[in-house]
Amino acid sequence: MAVVFLPGYIALRFLRFPRFGSFALAPAWTMAIVGIGAIVLNDGDVGWNRASFALLSVLVILICPIVRRHVSAVFGADRAPYGAYPRKTMAVAIGLPVAVLLVMLAPILILMDPTVPSWSPDPMFHYNGVNAVLLRENASMFGAMDTNHGIRVAGTVYPSVWHGIVSLVAATGTIVPASHVLAFVVIPIIWVVGMSYLATKALPYHPIAAMLVPVMLLAFPIFPGYLTVVNGLWPNSLALAATPAVMGAVVAAYHRYRWGGRQNAKEILLLSVAVVAVGVVGVAAAHPSTAFTLGWIAIPAVIMVVVHAMRDRLNAMQGRKGILLTVLVVLAMVAALALALSSSIVRDYLGRSMPRGWDDVSARLVSALAVWPVGRNPIVLAGASIVMVSAIVIGLRVVIRRRHLYWIALAWVMQTLLILGAFFPLGPLTSVAGLWYHNAYRLFAVQVIFLALILALAASEVIGWLSRFATKGAPARSMSAQTDVIARRPAFVGGMAAALIVVLFCASFVYNKPTVYAQAKPKFGADQILKSRAELDFIAHLDDYIPKRSIVVGDPTSGIAYAPAFGPIDSVFSSIVVRNVDVEGKILANGLRSIEYDPRVCQVLNAYGINYYYEDAPITYQGINGAESVPGLHSVDTSNGYFHLVAEVDGARLWQITGCPGRAEAPNWWNVRDRRLSVIQPPLDSVR
C-alpha cells in the first residue's frame, strides 16, 4: 500500500491537489514514476531497487513545489458544484466503499492461501518476471522481460510496472505472497477508491448516485475478481484499476476550467492537464492497452469539446483565423491517428483474424449488456435482458437531462460497440477490438466503469421515488434537494445502500460469482500443475537438495517453473509456452529424451550449465497435453546412464544430468549477453 500510494500522494499534495483526489490519483502517479523511472535508470546503467526508487520519488516530489511556485493557480476550493456531503452523512459516504471492499475481499482472502501459486497461465510468467527484475535490477519495459522466454534472450517490449512494484517489497522466496497482495488486495482498493472519486466528480448534481457507485461494482464479477483471480491478467488489472481516478481527474479539470471563472483559467487548465497527463502516462506504462481505451472512449467527448471551442472561437474571430484554427485541429487529430498507425505492433493487432461468427446472437447481445456471459437458457436470457435494459434505460433517462453527463452515455456506447466488434465480424469495429485480442472479458471490465455510473443514477432515481412515496413530497431532482434527503434521512439512504449491497451480492451469484471465488482456492491433484502440498514444499526447497543457482529443465506445467519464485533455483522455462525463437529451448523441449543420440542436447546443456531435470507426469493444461507440447521432456529414459536420481516426492523426481561428456564451468545464467546468440554449430533457424 505504501509503495503504491505514498509517492504519488505526497507529490500531488505538494501541488496542492485536493486530498481525496491525491489519494485516488496517487497509484497512477506512482506507476508513472515506476514506468518512466525504470526506463531512465536502465538507460543510465543504474539498478532498479528500493534505493533508486526512493531517489526517483524524492526527485519528483521536490519538483512539484517548484512547479507550483511557477504556476499562479493552485488547487484550492472549487466553484464547481461537487456537492460535498453534509457532515452527518460522511459516515455513510465513507462506510459504503469500505463495506464494498470487505464484501469483495473477504471471500477471496478466506479461500486463498497466499503462499500457493495461482494455477492460471499468466501468473507463472509474472512470478518469474518479478524474479528477473530482482536479479537483474532492470524494470524497464524495454528489457525487463528479455530473459523470461526460455534460454534464448530476445528483445522484448512488455509492460513491467507491475513487476517493478512487486520487486520493491518482495525478495527471493516471497515473490508469490507479495504478488498476491498486490493482485488480490491492493488492486481492489485502488479500484474502489478510484470509482468513488470518479463518482464525486462525474455526478456533481447527484450525491445519492455518487454514494451508490461503489456499491454497483458488486454487480459485476468480471472485475477485479475474474481478471485477477481467474485470468491472472495482473498488469492489465493494475492499469485498469487506476483508470477511473484518471477519468475523475479529467472531469475535475474540465469542471474547474468551466466553473472556476475567467481568473487564472489558463493556469488552472495548464496545471490540470499536467496532473492528468502524468496519470495517463502511469496507467499507459502499466499496460499500454489502457491508452487505447482512454483514446477510444474519449473520441465523442473530444469531438464535442472541439466543436464547441471552434464555434466559440469562430464567433469571436475573423474568418481567416477561424479557418486556420479548424485546419490545425484537424491536422492534430490526423497526426495522432498517423502516429498510432505507424507502429507495426498496432497494425498487427488491428489485422488480427476474427475467431467468431454470427452464432448465438441473442446470448452474445445479452452478455454485451450484462458484461458477463449469461449462458443460453432462455429464461436467464430474458431475465437478464429485462433487468439490465430497465436499469440502463432509467439511468440514461437521468443522463439525458444533464448535459454534463452526456459523456457517460457516449463512453458506454463506444465501449458497447467495441464489445460487439469482439463478438461479431463487424469490419472496422472488429479490427479495433483486435487491440484487445478480441477478448470480450477485457472489454467487459472497462465497461463496468460506465455501467456502474449509469446503474447508480438509476438506483438514485428509484430511491428518490421511494422517498417521495414515503414522505408524499416532491421528487428530489436538484443537487440541494438530494443533499437534503441525505441530510434528513441518512439512515434511510444508508439502509437502502446496505440492502442494495446484499441484493447485488446475492444476485451476482446468478452470474457464476461462486466460480470466480472458487478459483482463489489452492488447487492440488493429479490433473493440476501441483499434485500435492508436499510437491509444492519440494519445489520451494529445491536448494536443500542441489546447489543454489542450479538450472533445472522440465515441463513448465510440471511445477518446476514456480521454483525461481520460492528460492535461488533457476528454471529453463519460465512460462507455459516454449517459443519458436528459443532455438536451444526447443531442442531440449523436443529432444531431451534423445540425449543419447542427438549431440545438440548435450551441447546446449553444457553451454548453459543445465545440470538437472525435473520429471513429472504430463497433464492437460489449457486444452494442451504436456506430452504433445514438450514431448522431449516426457518419456525420458532415465536408466540410460545419463541421469542420477537426487530426490523424489509424490511421483515428481529430480535428476542430476551426469552423462554429457566435456562438461565445463557454466557461464552466469543471468549474463544475458551469453544467451543472445546461438551456441548450436552451425546455428539453426528452426528445430525439427
Model-inferred region functions:
Residues 39, 263-288:
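Membrane-interface alpha helices of multi-pass inner-membrane proteins
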